[in-house]
């Protein structure tokens, strides 16, 4: 089994004023919405800007410390991890991939450029949106092609994490790869170890029941296959890493909303 690695690094502007609340047990929860624009290199040499909004959660003493000090528009650096949560609501299982902050620090905004969305909320241009994961595939990759012939692969990654004084937890992350990277990933199999470098994106859609649904996933920019573990027993498959310039998707539309508070596991 691949050694678990689960790190998230974000630099963005606070799209709104952070929201502070407490659990019945008295635990402080600070929810922040960071907004930014990633500058990507496309296949044709262009540099499109792709907008993102990520919800970050800070707990405990740090939440109380920063709750009254942060305000809309401030630039913030976040180091944290992805945390998978599952709960049941009205007999239906729900899940969420959350960004849990371990460290937060405001940044000097001199020389930084901002943009505004249609609601006047700030986004940081040339922001930072990076994820590093290592885990094992939970299923064989699913490869398909768009009507334009572009390859896209979906992968499920299980990341094991053991923190000091706590039991081991497994976080389940959906990963998407495009073009040559997708075709390379399609040769992997369930159980293979995989190291992923990518960026966080959000999907939203309407279910068959008319309910709005959301999913946070990782768009892979680089994949590496460790030589140890289950993957080592497959000498006929390519033992190479692959990287791409950009996933080529625009997530600027449809991300104005986030799951309502009653859908969150707190």
Curated annotation (Swiss-Prot):
Motif Important for interaction with partner proteins per record, residues: 261-266
Protein name (database record): Single-stranded DNA-binding protein
Protein's organism: Thermus thermophilus
Biased composition (Acidic residues): 250-266
Domain SSB positions: 5-108, 128-227
InterPro entries on file: NA-bd_OB-fold, Primosome_PriB/ssb, ssDNA-bd
Molecular-function GO terms, alphabetical: single-stranded DNA binding
One of the GO BP terms on file: DNA recombination
PROSITE patterns: SSB
Keywords: DNA damage, DNA recombination, DNA repair, DNA replication, DNA-binding, Repeat
Region Disordered, annotated ranges: 226-266
Protein's gene: ssb
Physiological role: Plays an important role in DNA replication, recombination and repair. Binds to ssDNA and to an array of partner proteins to recruit them to their sites of action during DNA metabolism.
One GO CC term on file: nucleoid
